[in-house]
């Protein structure tokens, strides 16, 4: 992530961390062999933003002393009792789909699967990983062990883009979705993605979502199968979430710039005011967030995974310690607002 000009992102990031620190949540980190993660854990613990839990990596024993020196709770995934619980969960979830006991033990020792087992059991409130493991790895473990939230059929992701002011005097915080998971969403999936993004925006940013379903067309200015897809998604979305402020199809400028929105979609309550941008494909979303990050020097916080039963966030593999801290704060807010079980800080122990 390229840093935004300090005044652009500092207010939102400071508020994000302060809100998380008000009710610290237990967040587990399975990638402690990476120095960036250990650095982030130190800051998170020192500033009491979250209550970190560190997983030892059996494949990197040379890092264990450094992990234990962090002064936070440390868990060894190879300890018999803890491993057995994770293996039982894996077999319960996947045995009918061909997972053997031997393979379940192998997965159970893996820090990522072990950490998500802790999330599923309620031992911790959320998991942050992805600066070492791929998005596919992170999602596989999360779907196997945590699973989707009740009634959710589409797991997706969002970035929170903090940009310089362009509609007033204050920095903008925009939700970009989906930028990391669903490659070619159907109309139903686009509607699910929009609902998940709107729900998380309320939890994380604390304002009311105004959702623009993006296209190369604005309310009939263009035609084609991709435009039809977005229009169908809007119809489905309005039926599923009738109180949500949503419109589409809208072009990017019509969604964001009041003067353009008034000209291209004069009857829209969303045009020119959107704060949630739903892209029609992973190509569009991923390209857009990277361009805005690099050219506009926006802060890109995420990707934040949406739609899981409990929070599990996926970092960029280029994440800095600050990125990890910010995603951990968002993960904690997801857990707090979703009503995850309260935990008291556990002290400095190892299991």
Residue ranges and their predicted role:
Residues 2-271, 276-351:
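Anion-binding alpha/beta catalytic cores of soluble intermediary-metabolism enzymes, centered on
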